[in-house]
Amino acid sequence: MLFEGDFEKAIFHHEKAIEICPSDTYHIARYAVLLCYLGEPEKAMEQIKRAIRIDPFCSDLVLETEGLCHFVSGDFSSALTSFKKMQIETRTSLFYTAASLQKMGNSEEAQKILKVAQIESGMDNEKFVSSQLFQKETDKSSLSDALEAI
């Protein structure tokens, strides 16, 4: 539903899944991603903190979503910290790491990471940005502008 653009239905089903199984950190993390896309990174971060309390040895999905929350909130240093905790880098963590590094003025390292992200994912910047379903144009352009500046 999220990828179909039906955010109302996605919210309903995520909240219902969490109601049915409140200790499922996967659903909590996916709900937090949805909240970030809707421009509510603070609410999303509350969900991530809850997931980490439930499982302190959390999955990479929780850490990746934590990094996304920090990026959308403009806390690029904390975003990097979250992505570095991950066991396995993902295309999402690589693109956001590159964007965070660029936002922090570390263009050289950002360029290296972006190259890896593009090669491993087979995606260019535009295709990756279009896969991020931000509803606020400012959130989408923040990511896009950082990646294009590299």
Segments from the language model and where they lie:
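Alpha-helical protein-protein interaction modules
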Residues: 6-150
